[in-house]
């Protein structure tokens, strides 16, 4: 578990971040059921009263933590949510988006685990900004002439995200060097593209991806985090 330094309550912003950091560590380790305000407060180095001042209930703390993770994922994969708007399908670089998702998953397996556990427990997945944009973008793609007929955007979204977030766990990315993570990310992105290219996508519409799939693998370049 992450070793979180104690912070004084005199700095509310730093204290709030310390509490959220502790909550993220516990969520990644034990899931939502393993999070209590008292344990989070202890890990963050603050007293319970201070934790309750920032988050009145355990549920609000978990919700705030999940929102932070979702926003971080959104910025890393799609860009600034304040300026992105609804992207036109024809303008989306599918290979670049796939690469960004693969790199984020390889570099942040614990955050992806938090997000996935929270989404599975949510009564309304569409309330999550990252899921709404990811599934929504695939639905817009499925409705376009770039896709094969009959693509189920919801099922495809679950398949792609589950695979992207489980691969780093299988490959033990947390114990790998950066170069190894880049190579593992490339392998993941390559097979995601291959599955889509010859499944949901009309392959004749994507000559650049067809050409990429025919080349030898090279590690993914670093992508600036949002």
In which residue ranges do the predicted regions lie?
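Amphipathic alpha-helical packing segments from all-alpha helical-bundle domains
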Residues: 74-78, 119-147, 151-159, 187-190
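Helix-turn-helix
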Residues: 18, 22, 26-60, 64-65
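Alpha-helical DNA-contacting segments of helix-turn-helix folds
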Residues: 62-69, 127-130
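Amphipathic alpha-helical segments used for helix-helix packing
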Residues: 102-125, 131, 169-175
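Short, Lys/Arg-enriched anionic-surface-contact patches
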Residues: 7-15
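Short alpha-helical scaffolding segments that buttress acidic/His motifs in well-ordered protein cores
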Residues: 101, 115-118, 160, 164, ...
């Amino acid at each position: 578990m992450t070793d979180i330094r104690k912070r004084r309550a005199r700095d509310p912003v730093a204290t709030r971040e310390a509490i959220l950091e502790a909550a993220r560590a516990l969520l990644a380790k034990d899931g939502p059921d393993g999070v209590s305000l008292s344990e989070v407060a202890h890990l963050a180095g603050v007293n319970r009263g201070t934790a309750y001042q920032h988050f009145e209930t355990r549920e609000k703390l978990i919700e705030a933590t999940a929102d932070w993770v979702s926003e971080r994922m959104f910025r890393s994969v799609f860009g600034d949510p304040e300026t992105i708007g609804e992207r036109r399908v024809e303008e989306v670089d599918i290979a670049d988006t796939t690469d960004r998702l693969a790199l984020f998953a390889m570099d942040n397996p614990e955050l992806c685990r938090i997000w996935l556990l929270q989404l599975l427990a949510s009564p309304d997945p569409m309330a999550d900004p990252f899921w709404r944009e990811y599934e929504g973008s695939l639905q817009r793609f499925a409705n376009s002439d770039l896709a094969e007929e009959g693509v189920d955007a919801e099922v495809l979204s679950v398949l792609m995200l589950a695979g992207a977030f489980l691969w780093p766990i299988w490959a033990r990315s947390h114990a790998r060097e950066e170069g190894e993570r880049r190579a593992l990310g490339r392998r993941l992105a390559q097979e995601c593209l291959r599955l889509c290219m010859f499944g949901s996508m009309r392959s004749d519409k994507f000559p650049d991806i067809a050409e990429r799939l025919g080349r030898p693998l090279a590690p993914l370049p670093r992508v600036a985090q949002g």
